[in-house]
Amino acid sequence: MPVQGSQRRLLGSLNSTPTATPHLGLAANQTGARCREVSIPDGLFLSLGLVSLVENVLVVTAIAKNRNLHSPMYCFICCLALSDLLVSGSNMLETAVTLLLEAGALVARAAVVQQLDNVIDVITCSSMLSSLCFLGAIAVDRYISIFYALRYHSIVTLPRAQRAIAAIWVASVLCSTLFIAYYDHAAVLLCLVVFFLAMLVLMAVLYVHMLARACQHAQGIARLHKRQRLAHQGFGLKGAATLTILLGIFFLCWGPFFLHLTLIVLCPQHPTCSCIFKNFNLFLALIICNAIIDPLIYAFRSQELRRTLKEVLLCSW
């Protein structure tokens, strides 16, 4: 796949269009000091990937070990951790191979390197897509548990969850394979952007509706106990803050990458867009940061999972 400068080969095709390449130098001259590339050292990439790898391995291990966590909700959380694990692991592998090749410690034919690059691209793309899907699945699961509490266990059964998980993985692999094969088509990039926006809207609508229901419930309790009105106000502020953090982190970590894809379609030759293209590695680093944050939001808040994790860590010593 074509790449530019020091940028990683992994997903490098997203940041190189034949028509835009001659304009990169022009962008630097026209925008001057404003056109800056945020350099991401390889050591930082490896460190972020390692932290994410350890976190998500612990989540998967804890859920696999404790049978009490073999519910649909934790199955989705486990698959999210596995997706984030693959995102981090593939980036670490790509960075390590690149460093070894540049240092001359690893010798391989160009065809072999190209095949390895394509495999890593497919793994990374499929894990990104599956990660977004499982974030949406977790939101849907929580929504059903709140609005259809009495019927939850008949609606969200383990077999249905397993079928949904299998469908997500298969669809992610197939879509990522097509994406790698036709990465230079604008329609492919637009499909990815639309998919991201759909997941963002889905999560925002569901979580806002859940927050409204929780505030309504707290308000009803406050009416019965007038002294608890201040507590109700505090609950509303806390819920709004939690929702803002959850959606804010999702948008901050994933948004720049999909903005990058959008600009490739809309303005591949514009100097300002070319400046944004130079920060492709930063956008990948933000996605890895999201893989670090996901366990803190969705997994480690569970008391049962933390207890199991503590047992796993104690047994390993």
UniProtKB/Swiss-Prot annotation:
GO terms for molecular function: melanocyte-stimulating hormone receptor activity. A lipid is attached at C315 (S-palmitoyl cysteine). Gene3D superfamilies: Rhodopsin 7-helix transmembrane proteins. Residues 64-72, 141-163, 212-240, 301-317 are cytoplasmic. Keywords: Cell membrane, G-protein coupled receptor, Glycoprotein, Lipoprotein, Membrane, Palmitate, Receptor, Transducer, Transmembrane, Transmembrane helix. Residues 1-37, 94-118, 184-191, 267-279 are extracellular. CDD domains: 7tmA_MC1R. Expressed in the adrenal gland. The chain crosses the membrane at residues 38-63, 73-93, 119-140, 164-183, 192-211, 241-266, 280-300. Glycans are attached at N29. InterPro entries: GPCR_Rhodpsn, GPCR_Rhodpsn_7TM, Melcrt_ACTH_rcpt, MSH_rcpt. One of its GO terms (biological process) is regulation of metabolic process. Its main location: membrane. Belongs to the G-protein coupled receptor 1 family. Receptor for MSH (alpha, beta and gamma) and ACTH. The activity of this receptor is mediated by G proteins which activate adenylate cyclase. Mediates melanogenesis, the production of eumelanin (black/brown) and phaeomelanin (red/yellow), via regulation of cAMP signaling in melanocytes. Interacts with MGRN1, but does not undergo MGRN1-mediated ubiquitination; this interaction competes with GNAS-binding and thus inhibits agonist-induced cAMP production. Interacts with OPN3; the interaction results in a decrease in MC1R-mediated cAMP signaling and ultimately a decrease in melanin production in melanocytes. This is Melanocyte-stimulating hormone receptor. The gene is MC1R.
